[in-house]
Amino acid sequence: MESPVPIAGKMADKLQLIVTNLHWRYSGVTATNRMVAPKLADMFDAAWLGSDAPAGIARMDIGDLMKLWLRRKPVIWHARRNNEMIAGVLLKALGWPLKLLFTSAAQRHHTWITRWLISRMDAIIATSDISASYLKRSATVVTHGVDTDRYAPPVDRAAAFAEAKLPGRYAIGCFGRVRAQKGTDLFVDAMCELLPRYPDFTAVIVGAITPDQIGFANELKRKIADAGLQSRIVITGELPIDEVERWYRRLTIYAFTSRSEGFGLTLIEAMSAGAALVATRAGAAEIVIEEGVTGNLVPTGDAAALTLALEPLMRDPDAATAMGAYARQRVLDRFSLDAEARGIAEVYRRLL
């Protein structure tokens, strides 16, 4: 059920924060935004503007936004995309009392338009020191967090796996949109080599196949069929978030295979659920993973290295389970949603 539209009566005067999500497609940015927004709404008078509003935060629409014009008391406009920064800059120029904040996850040099937009912000958050290093101004580093209650290990992982009615005893997964940037092809290549040697494992790919990636996905399916592994490499397509959480709980091993990434939320989601990790050196992997303790790192784009790193865990599921327990503790200690919310809240308070 959607939260009610909030801007009525005194709410327009009390509003402190607008969380923007001006994007039609559900993405990793949307996921991180949705997770932390209700926590922030517990600390500030907040409203969500845009699609995919989560429970726990009031919603607003364009009509509600119009009611804030020429209000004296400032309101934080928290943007995570270029179009949201553009909207904030324009509204502020036209008289809306906005304090502009941008969260940057990109680990690359920004385009000129993004650099200009960033220069117009009142404050910047970077999701890692690496992301901060690409900015031309100071930023507060606040790493992403995950809801460790929702992404929790199952009481009985064997029973959780059995619910899926898949062959074998263990699951190894790779989650995210099916495309080359996410390295789905690397995972398929590794599984085509490893699964024949480890019959107790089934591989699961969870993520959307967008229209522009149908050809890419069909080529993966051809490889899987040629290897005779149609029943042991399962591509689910896009799933509701509660189904995705259920799949995390079934995993013994998680492969993070991105060639490039901003942060890579699936890293900490899988760790929180107690999966052992093998990850490419993309996004926040080098920050999140303790090499040899909570996971292992491999170069990006290297299917052979990925295969080599995954095999010892598939050979010894008990060792993978122990590594997953350390991974879970690492998230509890360093990457909880509460810690992220506290870090963002400190920036908000400076702006207000």
Indicate where each model-derived feature is located.
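Aromatic "clamp/platform" in nucleotide-sugar-dependent glycosyltransferases that forms part
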Residues: 259
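Short hydrophobic beta-strand element within catalytic cores of glycosyltransferases
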Residues: 276-280, 289
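Short alpha-helical donor nucleotide-sugar binding micro-motif in glycosyltransferases
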Residues: 238-239, 246-251
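Donor nucleotide-sugar binding/catalytic pocket of nucleotide-sugar-dependent glycosyltransferases
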Residues: 118-157, 166-167, 174
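Conserved acidic donor-binding segment of nucleotide-sugar-dependent glycosyltransferases
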Residues: 291-292, 296-304, 312-318
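A short, well-ordered alpha-helix in the C-terminal region of glycosyltransferases
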Residues: 312, 319-334, 340-343
